A protein has these predicted regions:
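Internal, well-ordered alpha-helical segments in soluble enzyme and binding-protein domains
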Residues: 159-162, 172
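Short, structured patches in soluble enzyme cores that scaffold and shape functional sites
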Residues: 69-71, 113-114, 133-137, 162, ...
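A contiguous strand-loop segment
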Residues: 16-158, 186-188, 258, 279, ...
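Gly-rich Lys/Arg/Thr-decorated short loops/hinges at beta-loop-alpha junctions or inter-strand turns
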Residues: 6-7, 156-160
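Short histidine-centered catalytic/ligand-binding loop motif
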Residues: 152, 161-167
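C-terminus-biased signal that marks the final domain/tail of proteins
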Residues: 1-53, 58, 167-305
Length: 305
């Protein structure tokens, strides 16, 4: 999509400051697509500050782990009065793709992504772990990290680049958890991580420089799922944006005995968990390698977020 309201050419020089291979991939996308380099750079940056999501990991009574997410994007970035929808999700739905990353003709990981975007927000290493990233709104947020990067302070990882790096290189749940917990980042985030053994599921709450909390599955005490929207679990969500309570209510009513991917899809289809910002839903089951994504549209009556 075109952002004529911004002079995006000023972002083009920043591409060379990005780590390899992301810088070269962005240049390649610009060359092949014919889009200005600054516009492709912007397309790869603004996910650091505008993503609103719901992610969960759940374990059934047999020890099978499920991981799913709604990706909601484009809050306050333009409302289409005629279609009664946000403009950005309308642009992004046709760009949504499922990718299979291979090395030596062997699948390393799978991801739901947007064409032209080199970072990762949702992915699975089949048989090993699943991973989603949700934005964490904070005063010391993504804007600050990006400004510091522009000014030359570049000692942190871009969130989506870290997610991709973990999907590419981590070979176990424990290794992925360690990298997501300890790597310095440009923006605060929630990483929702699922493994391949009973009890392996957590929400990692991150500031830009530290890990603030790791909320883990705890079956002995009845915690058979973890669920994250965009608020710290020890705080109440904003009353205008409470997706957490309805989602948890649906999960509790479903029960651990009856949890499954179709049941989780139904949970993520419940309003306001499903809303006008929802672009796609991804369902993952690590042991079988099941990886499914669905484009979403919330029919009226439906809340904006």
């Amino acid at each position: 999509f075109s952002c004529s309201w911004a002079k995006l050419s000023v972002l083009a020089p920043l591409v060379d400051t990005l780590p390899f291979p992301f810088n070269e991939e962005i240049k390649g996308i610009a060359d092949v697509s014919g889009l200005p380099l600054g516009e492709v750079m912007f397309f790869n940056v603004f996910y650091e500050i505008f993503t609103v999501c719901t992610s969960l990991v759940a374990e059934d009574t047999t020890g099978k782990l499920y991981h799913a997410r709604n990706l909601d994007f484009g809050l306050f970035l333009g409302w289409d009065i005629k279609k009664h929808s946000w403009e950005i999700p309308e642009y992004l739905r046709p760009l949504t793709v499922n990718l299979d990353f291979q090395r030596n003709n062997k699948t390393i990981f799978k991801s739901t992504n947007f064409a032209g975007y080199v970072g990762m927000l949702t992915g699975m290493r089949p048989g090993i772990f699943t991973l989603t990233m949700n934005e964490r709104f904070n005063i010391d947020g993504g804007y600050i990290g990006i400004i510091e990067w522009i000014l030359g302070k570049r000692d942190g990882f871009w969130m989506s680049f870290l997610t991709r790096s973990v999907l590419e290189n981590a070979t176990s749940y424990a290794q992925a958890k360690d990298q997501l917990t300890n790597t310095k980042m440009l923006a605060p985030a929630y990483f929702i991580l699922g493994g391949n053994r009973s009890g392996e599921g957590c929400v990692i709450t991150r500031s830009r420089k530290a890990c603030l909390d790791v909320w883990e599955l705890d079956l002995k005490h009845g915690s058979w799922y973890v669920l994250e929207t965009n608020y710290d679990r020890w705080k109440d969500p904003l009353f205008l944006d409470n997706r957490r309570t309805p989602a948890m209510k649906c999960l509790n009513e479903t029960t651990q005995k009856k949890i499954s991917l179709p049941a989780i899809y139904d949970v993520l289809s419940t309003k306001p968990v499903l809303n006008k910002l929802t672009t796609y839903t991804t369902l993952m089951e690590v042991s079988s390698g099941t990886f499914e994504a669905y484009l979403r549209d919330c029919p009226d009556p439906c809340i904006p977020w």
